[in-house]
Amino acid sequence: MDFIRAIILGIIEGITEWLPISSTGHLIIADEFIRLNQSAAFKEMFDVVIQLGAILSVVVLYFHKLNPFNKLNPADKQKTPREIQLTWRLWLKVLIAALPAAIIGLPLNDWLDKHFYHFVPVAFMLIIYGVAFIVIERRWVPNHEFSVMDIDRLPYRAALYIDLFQVLSLLPGTSRSGATIVGALLIGVSREVAAEFTFFLGIPVMFGASFIKILHFFKNGNSLNFEQFGVLLVACLVAFGVSMVAIKFLTDYVKKHDFTFFGKYRIVLGIVLLIYAAFKAFLG
């Protein structure tokens, strides 16, 4: 039965990790109705490490762009020195941008999980960023031109600014992709570049978060049995496959549409969560 739950959770992770609707928020909701029959320590680790499947999809889909020594496609010759230089610069921007979230997130991670990993905080963050998306798309974007239309032209300073918004996503319900996209739009980065840079920015952040959770899991005296390993592996594989589809969907979507729909979705979901939390509290 846990393997079926792992498949469902993998689907949820694969969809919500890349769309700006908060994967953590959706996993909190899912945990209310689809609980793994495992220890609390394993479930805490599972909710983070499942992201490995999602982030590996980025590495696979964008391998040609992320690997400075790879061919652009099978028919191309080796990358030119200029293309190699641009790839290394992209990695430097990603690493620079990941620093604030790492510096602030590492010491605060456990405290934030303890105090904000609940329905009500998640609901409020869903609503707040939902409103932010709608306001930015309807009020800010129409009055400001996009100044960065190519990821290779993204300034280092802009990359750092975007990650300062990613720091806000440490609060469950915010959405890592949502926070970085909001930040990118505010500083004049196009929707396409904002989405793509968000994908890349997730690589060090999510690998790092998964490594830390695994380390804490074993450091606290826990062990991983064969069934738990299988459940985690299945969830990661499903998240990987679904993420491939979700990423392609988002990259195509932002070419023709803005993020208003996601803002509305977040607001509706946040309100539903608040009603559910109030109803649950009323029933005791």
From Swiss-Prot:
It holds the Pfam family BacA. InterPro entries: UppP. The keyword Transcription regulation does not apply. The chain crosses the membrane at residues 7-27, 44-64, 90-110, 116-136, 167-187, 197-217, 229-249, 259-279. One of its GO terms (cellular component) is plasma membrane. HAMAP family: Undec_diphosphatase. This is Undecaprenyl-diphosphatase. It comes from Lactococcus lactis subsp. cremoris (strain MG1363). The gene is uppP.
